[in-house]
């Protein structure tokens, strides 16, 4: 990153941490330190962590963006987004663009997001606790069943130490897993869960499951952004963790 910034001026460095769907972790403070040295601002997509777990502005970021459709709304019934800034000049620019483009949420959608904020902390802590249990169980499965588990709460995750430092109270509710039997096994697996619903969204109280390569990330196949075909992304809800694990087990047993 520093090499790129030193050779050309950029207005922003964009960061998503944890990233979708491989949950890669970026050190926000270190990124901000380098970017600011070259007069570049840092914008962080904090959707996966939510403001309950991670505070990018406190770590040096200049702009934070959210899909409020996900954890902030939390009930799979609103579509929205938010931009959070820490200086008046940037706020005025964003407000002007919002007004000019008409990107203003309805009163009801705003009410739904405000309602979600009331329980955000409780929900995200339960999401995180359940996700850690699910990730640990998946990681304990034989290597001929589970190739790899991606979850920043696991010590095996390459970004675990950074995540533990900059995330507070949990590691989020998203777990990604690669099945050893390949892409068709991944599709068969998600077709046979009973509690997990096959759907593309995430962050609601109910558990969802999908195959990114065939669904959310199908459009980036063949590019540097493509994801493994055997990858399954799991949005772990707030149901009983033992029930969720039992559901995953019976679906794996059917492969």
Predicted regions span which residues?
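A common structural junction motif
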Residues: 101-102, 193-201, 251-255
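Short, glycine-/Ser/Thr-/acidic-enriched flexible segments
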Residues: 88-90, 156, 180-182, 214, ...
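PLP-dependent enzyme catalytic core of the Aspartate aminotransferase-like
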Residues: 6, 191, 207-255
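Conserved PLP-enzyme active-site core in the AAT-like
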Residues: 1-144, 150, 156
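Short, flexible turn/loop "capping" segments at secondary-structure junctions
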Residues: 74-75, 107-109, 167-170, 224-229
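Short, solvent-exposed beta-strand edge segments and adjacent coil->beta transition regions
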Residues: 78-80, 170-174, 229-233
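Short, well-ordered beta-strand elements within core beta-sheets of diverse protein domains
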Residues: 113-122, 172-180, 233-237
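Conserved small-domain helix->loop->beta segment predominantly found in fold-type I
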Residues: 132-194, 198-203, 217-223
């Amino acid at each position: 990153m520093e090499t790129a910034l030193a050779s050309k001026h950029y207005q922003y460095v964009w960061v998503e941490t944890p990233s979708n769907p491989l949950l890669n972790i970026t050190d926000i403070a270190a990124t901000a330190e380098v970017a600011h040295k070259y007069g570049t601002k840092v914008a962080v997509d904090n959707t996966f962590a939510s403001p309950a777990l991670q505070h990018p502005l406190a770590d040096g970021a200049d702009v934070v963006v959210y899909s409020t459709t996900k954890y902030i709304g939390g009930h799979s019934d609103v579509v929205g987004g938010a931009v959070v800034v820490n200086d008046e000049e940037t706020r005025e620019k964003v407000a002007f663009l919002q007004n000019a483009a008409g990107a203003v949420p309805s009163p009801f959608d705003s009410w739904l997001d405000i309602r979600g904020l009331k329980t955000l902390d409780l929900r995200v802590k339960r999401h995180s606790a359940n996700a850690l249990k699910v990730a640990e169980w998946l990681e304990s499965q034989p290597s001929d069943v589970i190739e790899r588990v991606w979850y920043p709460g696991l010590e095996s995750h390459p970004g675990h130490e950074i995540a533990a430092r900059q995330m507070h109270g949990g590691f989020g509710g998203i777990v990604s897993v690669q099945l050893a039997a390949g892409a068709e096994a991944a599709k068969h697996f998600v077709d046979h869960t009973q509690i997990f619903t096959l759907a593309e969204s995430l962050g609601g109280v109910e558990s969802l499951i999908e195959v990114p390569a065939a669904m959310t990330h199908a459009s980036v196949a063949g590019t540097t952004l493509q994801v493994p075909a055997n990858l399954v992304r799991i949005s772990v809800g707030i149901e009983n963790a033992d029930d969720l694990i039992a559901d995953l087990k019976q679906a794996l047993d059917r492969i």
